[in-house]
UniProtKB/Swiss-Prot annotation:
Keywords (A to Z) from UniProt: Amino-acid biosynthesis, Cytoplasm, Diaminopimelate biosynthesis, Lysine biosynthesis, NAD, NADP, Oxidoreductase
GO cellular component, as recorded: cytosol
Gene3D superfamilies attached to this UniProt entry: Dihydrodipicolinate Reductase, domain 2, NAD(P)-binding Rossmann-like Domain
Name of the protein: 4-hydroxy-tetrahydrodipicolinate reductase
GO MF terms held by the record: 4-hydroxy-tetrahydrodipicolinate reductase; NAD binding; NADP binding; oxidoreductase activity, acting on CH or CH2 groups, NAD or NADP as acceptor
Keyword Cytoplasm among UniProt keywords: yes
Catalytic activity: (S)-2,3,4,5-tetrahydrodipicolinate + NAD(+) + H2O = (2S,4S)-4-hydroxy-2,3,4,5-tetrahydrodipicolinate + NADH + H(+); (S)-2,3,4,5-tetrahydrodipicolinate + NADP(+) + H2O = (2S,4S)-4-hydroxy-2,3,4,5-tetrahydrodipicolinate + NADPH + H(+)
Organism: Prochlorococcus marinus (strain MIT 9313)
Keyword Cell membrane: no
């Protein structure tokens, strides 16, 4: 494995050939304080290809592998973590079905996980927090790396103090596997922190088509998910009151919007104690 000067942060990207993974590799390559040391992806027929050439950004001397365990083992040996501010960082943009095991493996090998994959359950997050504590390591699960989305979430939480009726809608590309999005769930959780109930029914509702009114949370908030080609990531929170409505909306039109948040997290995760959930905890 290529040696990395001590002032650089060694980074492994899992899901390297995906849309987000490829964008992260490009951002890491351009960052003056980071160095790509591993790339993992299970796309058939790509084992061993040079990842920089595959993505059209020049040779990076990093061969793509499908074996995350072998990659983590090699990285752990090359960049051994002996205390805070040390060790390698894993950035994961893969699939809800595998991200939990990837995160556990990262902690086991002493590699700090930065998880952008959504779909982790509450219990899985609790378990991962325990793994982080036992390993005395920092890690981060970030449902959305956009600073603009963090501002929307904070505005929605503030507005929830004054409005009793609200619904959330998230729109994504049709290759997103989980619904509702982790960002939408996180927004609802922030709105619910006051402990109030929303959307007291005015009539006895009847759905002629099951699911027409969206997913119902215990608080009364309803979450709606749309999946269409041509979309990237979009979210809207609409509040209603007699005589008015108040709408908050954020649109991501290109994945490059997430890269400042990704790099911010990569730079901070090695200094963290325990597992952090949400970009707002870091800015």
């Amino acid at each position: 494995m290529t040696s990395v000067p001590p002032e650089l942060i060694p980074v492994v990207v899992v899901g390297a050939l995906g849309r987000m993974g490829a964008e992260v590799i490009k951002a890491v390559h351009l960052a003056s304080d980071c160095e790509l040391v591993g790339a993992v992806d299970t796309t058939p027929g790509k084992e061993g290809v040079e990842i920089g050439e595959e993505l059209g950004i020049g040779v990076l001397d990093v061969a793509l592998t499908s074996d995350i365990e072998a990659c983590l083992c090699s990285v752990s040996q090359s960049f051994h973590r002996t205390g805070p501010g040390q060790g390698a960082v894993l950035v994961d943009f893969t699939h809800p079905s595998v991200v939990y095991e990837h995160t556990r493996a990262a902690f086991a090998y002493g590699v700090h996980p930065v998880i952008g994959t959504t779909g982790l359950s509450h219990q899985q997050l609790v378990d991962l927090s325990e793994f982080a504590a036992k390993a005395s390591m920092g890690g981060a699960v970030i449902p959305n790396f956009s600073v603009g989305m963090v501002l929307l979430q904070q505005a929605a939480a503030a507005a929830a103090r004054f409005y009793d009726n609200a619904e959330l809608t998230e729109l994504h590309h049709n290759r997103k596997a989980d619904a509702p999005s982790g960002t939408c769930i996180k927004t609802a959780e922030m709105m619910e922190e006051l402990g109030k109930s929303f959307n007291s029914p005015e009539v006895d509702e009847h759905e002629s088509l099951t699911g027409s009114r969206g997913g119902l949370r215990a608080s009364g908030l309803r979450l709606h998910s749309l999946r269409l080609p041509g979309l990237v990531a979009h979210q809207e929170v609409m509040f209603g009151a007699p005589g008015e409505s108040y709408t908050l909306r954020h649109d991501t039109i290109d994945r490059s919007a997430y890269m400042p948040g990704v790099l911010l997290t990569v730079r901070k995760v090695r200094q963290l104690q325990g597992l952090v959930y949400g970009l707002e905890r870091l800015i």
